């Protein structure tokens, strides 16, 4: 496994890419309300990227065995776990949707993040799922420092999630990122402390847990080749940040003016 350690210049470029990715989510946030379609959300995201001078990393993206992805964003509604394709179905009160944005800057750096959105008044269970998934992401992030392991991140997320009656999707994970969309290492959201790759200053990767209200099993929906849903049709939520390992801890880079407030137990976005 070859992990790319980023230089100070690389990290400076990634801060820009990550801020721009977060600002796409800021741009679309006021528009996400009952009646909007995910296709319109996708159009707004593309509009913002054009204004920034970035491009979408997802549109046309085609890893081996997959068809080209058709959207500028991923929009995963309710029981869709990830890779939901934007469509013309209006969102309604009570829906939850994850919007996942990855941009590429003119100089070839990637920034990747996602947020959950609650459409109108949602059920207590839906609100709880989104909030706990947000907290789980941050608990994972807080484990990051030189000398810690990937297993520390996964264990923190898994222990918290399962302790609150949620299940952790295991088939999808966080990933290294830089001048490629997906680099080593893979960041599992479950695991045992003290196991796996030891973290080093300059590593850059995403933490992006997917948690389900029901069981963890998932399946591919239909024949589009992308959309993943919970097998038991239970709600699923995901939050995502890109971060860099610093000399003493971590720095979350996918932050902007509209980023959600930190959980009460988090006092800083870098340490």
Enumerate the language-model features and the residues they cover.
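Active-site neighborhoods and metal-handling regions in enzymes and metal-associated proteins
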Residues: 1-271
């Amino acid at each position: 496994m070859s992990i790319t350690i980023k230089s100070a210049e690389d990290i400076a470029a990634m801060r820009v890419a990550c801020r721009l990715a977060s600002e796409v989510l800021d741009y679309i946030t006021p528009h996400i309300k009952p009646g909007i379609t995910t296709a319109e959300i996708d159009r707004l995201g593309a509009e913002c990227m054009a204004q920034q001078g970035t491009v979408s990393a997802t549109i046309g993206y085609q890893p081996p065995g997959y068809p080209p992805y058709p959207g500028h964003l991923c929009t995963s509604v309710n029981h869709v776990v990830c890779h939901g394709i934007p469509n013309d179905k209006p969102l309604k009160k009570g829906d939850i949707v994850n919007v996942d944005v990855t941009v590429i800057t003119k100089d070839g750096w990637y920034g990747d993040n996602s947020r959950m959105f609650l459409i109108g008044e949602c059920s207590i269970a839906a609100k709880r799922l989104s909030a706990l998934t947000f907290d789980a992401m941050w608990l994972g992030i807080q484990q990051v420092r030189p000398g810690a392991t990937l297993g520390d991140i996964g264990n923190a997320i898994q222990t918290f999630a399962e302790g609150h009656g949620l299940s952790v999707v295991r088939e999808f994970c966080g990933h290294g990122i830089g001048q490629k969309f997906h680099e080593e290492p893979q960041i599992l959201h479950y695991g045992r402390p003290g196991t796996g790759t030891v973290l080093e200053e300059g590593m850059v990767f995403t933490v992006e847990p997917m948690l389900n209200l029901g069981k963890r099993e998932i399946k591919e929906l239909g024949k589009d080749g992308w959309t993943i849903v919970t097998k038991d049709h239970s709600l699923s939520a995901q939050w995502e940040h890109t971060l860099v390992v610093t000399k003493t801890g971590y720095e979350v880079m996918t932050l902007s003016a509209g980023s959600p407030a930190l959980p009460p137990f988090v006092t800083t976005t870098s340490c």
